């Protein structure tokens, strides 16, 4: 039997008898430990040898023997808990301790900086698993950030100013409006050791052609080593930014044959995935990264939904609960929570119904019904971006005839959506409208793969906003279902850099197709000893650029 299993058995005994010495029998102990009398005798011998207890046996069946505890079960439990924490076995820790509040405090005490075996380790607490890290698929906000740490594109978009920077390619040029050339760095390696080949780039980009944003790519070739040519059906001013977006990250061409690639992907980025399961994501600095090696050696993201649900709205937590004075940064998101009206729905495609719903469901009406801790993090939205005021207040018209029931759909693992849907239910019920709630996984929501009148979601944009605002929404199949046919004309104007984003956004809002609700305050909590931390528009920070000052500094 392993030491950990023996410790658990001892703790069960200690808890059963409250640490008090007692007279008992082998049969009674067998019932406590749910095993045979013979096995109990073996366990007692091992526990006695470890110095945890003294077992003074009396000969004969049914004879009462003396059980004397020499070690506190609490002390042993604490020792074992510390070992599990050190080994990042959070699931086993929850089973061992049992008390969720106690586990939470233990975890919070270990957040932030750790120094082990010569390595700098950053520990983060998060509220849900990060199970899909495959570029080119439906990625939520935090998955998008992680993918940027694991992969590279031909170009990179600077998170702070939106400027285009070299990445896998060191230079690029437009030979003609329909022909772009990228010059790649040599000797770039994937995390599994193989050198990047031009065929990896070609396969990574051609796999994206079926997607709306990439449908104008005609062909990708490599005329000579370390050169990639991209041919287009129509000109695209934004192509270099598009090839630096998270969808266009470069994968090894054999990615489909790699086991569980969406969860444990292989890239060329500054961090490689060591472990990714439902309770932990661990990434490690890649020593053969072609850029500057990351300064933090390892990032551990502990996932405990039942212990960290409030992180849905409070932000990324790198330190214990007493960090009010240690908040690193906060910002109002570039994006919003919103309602989309599905044009496939007979009710949602009716302008009068959409107008009436938007007049009823105002940000102020929702905030007035929200709990105080939500009010702290929500700011009323009157446009897609905080600086835009496109949603004009109008007088409430009478309810359209025949409107008695609506279906609202949102994605799971997001407690704020539950709160918003409850408020919407109350507002509509007061008007005689029943609201049916439908919850999907994120991929089905992203695809719009359900019948619904209204869709509840959120979008986070990044710099440059002229690129990301349209790109983020247009690449979403759900939006293709919900918006009018004009969207397909808008893509050409956007690619020509003639689409004015403020006007485009105002059109969607004024036509009651896209209804902004809130802008969210993003907050990053952590230690002031951390340096190089700049919160990005996704509420995270670039791991490879962060570092710790020595404790005495």
Swiss-Prot record:
Keyword Electron transport: no
CDD domains xrefs: PBP2_SgrR_like
UniProt keyword terms in alphabetical order: Activator, DNA-binding, Repressor, Transcription, Transcription regulation
Positions of the HTH marR-type domain: 1-113
Signal peptide coordinates: none
Organism domain of life: Bacteria
DNA-binding region coordinates: 26-49
Pfam family, one: SgrR_N
GO molecular function: DNA binding; peptide transmembrane transporter activity
InterPro entries: SBP_5, SBP_5_dom, SgrR_HTH_N, Tscrpt_reg_SgrR, WH_DNA-bd_sf
GO biological process: negative regulation of DNA-templated transcription; peptide transport; positive regulation of DNA-templated transcription
Region (Solute-binding): 163-494
Chain's role: Activates the small RNA gene sgrS under glucose-phosphate stress conditions as well as yfdZ. Represses its own transcription under both stress and non-stress conditions. Might act as a sensor of the intracellular accumulation of phosphoglucose by binding these molecules in its C-terminal solute-binding domain.
HAMAP family: HTH_type_SgrR
NCBIfam families per the UniProt record, alphabetical: PRK13626.1 (NF010149)
Name this protein carries in UniProt: HTH-type transcriptional regulator SgrR
Gene expressing this chain: sgrR
């Amino acid at each position: 039997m392993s030491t950990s299993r023996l410790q658990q058995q001892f703790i069960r005994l200690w808890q059963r008898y409250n640490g008090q010495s007692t007279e008992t029998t082998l049969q009674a102990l067998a019932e406590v430990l749910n095993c045979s009398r013979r096995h109990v005798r073996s366990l007692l011998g091992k526990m006695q040898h470890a110095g945890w207890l003294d077992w003074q046996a009396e000969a004969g069946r049914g004879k009462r023997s003396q059980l004397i505890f020499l070690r506190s079960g609490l002390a042993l439990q604490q020792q074992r808990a510390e070992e599990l924490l050190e080994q990042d076995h959070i699931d086993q820790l929850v089973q061992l301790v049992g008390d969720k509040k106690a586990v939470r405090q233990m975890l919070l005490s270990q957040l932030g900086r750790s120094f082990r075996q010569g390595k700098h380790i950053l520990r983060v607490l998060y509220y849900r698993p990060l199970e899909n890290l495959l570029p080119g698929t439906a990625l939520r906000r935090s998955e998008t950030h992680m993918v940027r740490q694991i992969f590279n594109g031909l170009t990179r978009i600077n998170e702070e100013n939106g400027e285009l920077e070299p990445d896998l390619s060191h230079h690029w040029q437009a030979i003609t409006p329909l022909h772009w050339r990228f010059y790649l760095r040599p000797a770039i390696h994937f995390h599994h050791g193989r050198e990047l080949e031009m065929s990896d780039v070609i396969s990574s980009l051609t796999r994206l052609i079926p997607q709306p944003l990439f449908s104008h790519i005609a062909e990708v070739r490599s005329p000579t080593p370390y050169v990639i040519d991209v041919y287009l059906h129509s000109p695209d001013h934004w192509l270099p930014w598009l090839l630096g977006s998270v969808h266009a990250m470069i994968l090894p061409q054999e990615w489909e044959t790699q086991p569980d690639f969406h969860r444990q992907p292989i890239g060329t980025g500054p961090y490689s995935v060591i472990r990714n399961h439902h309770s932990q994501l661990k990434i490690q600095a890649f020593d053969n990264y072609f850029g500057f090696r990351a300064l933090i050696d390892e990032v551990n993201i502990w996932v405990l939904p039942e212990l960290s649900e409030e992180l849905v709205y409070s932000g990324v937590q790198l330190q214990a609960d007493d960090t009010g004075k240690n908040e690193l940064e906060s910002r109002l998101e570039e994006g919003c929570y919103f309602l989309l009206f599905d044009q496939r729905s007979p009710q949602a495609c009716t302008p009068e119904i959409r107008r009436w719903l938007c007049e009823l469901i105002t940000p102020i009406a929702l905030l007035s019904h929200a709990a105080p801790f939500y009010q702290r993090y929500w700011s009323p939205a009157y446009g897609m971006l905080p600086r835009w005021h496109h949603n004009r207040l109008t007088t409430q018209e009478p309810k359209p005839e025949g409107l008695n029931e609506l279906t609202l759909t949102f994605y799971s693992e997001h407690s704020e959506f539950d709160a918003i849907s409850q408020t919407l239910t109350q507002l509509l019920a007061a008007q005689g409208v029943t609201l049916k709630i439908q919850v999907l996984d994120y991929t089905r929501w992203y695809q719009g793969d359900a019948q619904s009148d209204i869709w509840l979601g959120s979008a986070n944009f990044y710099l440059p906003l002229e690129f990301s605002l349209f790109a983020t929404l247009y690449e979403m199949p759900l939006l293709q279902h919900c918006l009018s046919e004009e969207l397909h004309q808008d893509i050409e104007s956007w690619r020509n850099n003639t689409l004015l984003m403020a006007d485009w956004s105002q059109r969607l809002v004024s036509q009651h197709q896209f209804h902004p609700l809130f802008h969210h305050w993003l907050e990053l909590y952590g230690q002031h000893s951390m340096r190089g931390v700049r919160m990005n528009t996704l509420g995270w920070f670039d791991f490879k650029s962060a570092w710790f000052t020595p404790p005495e500094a």
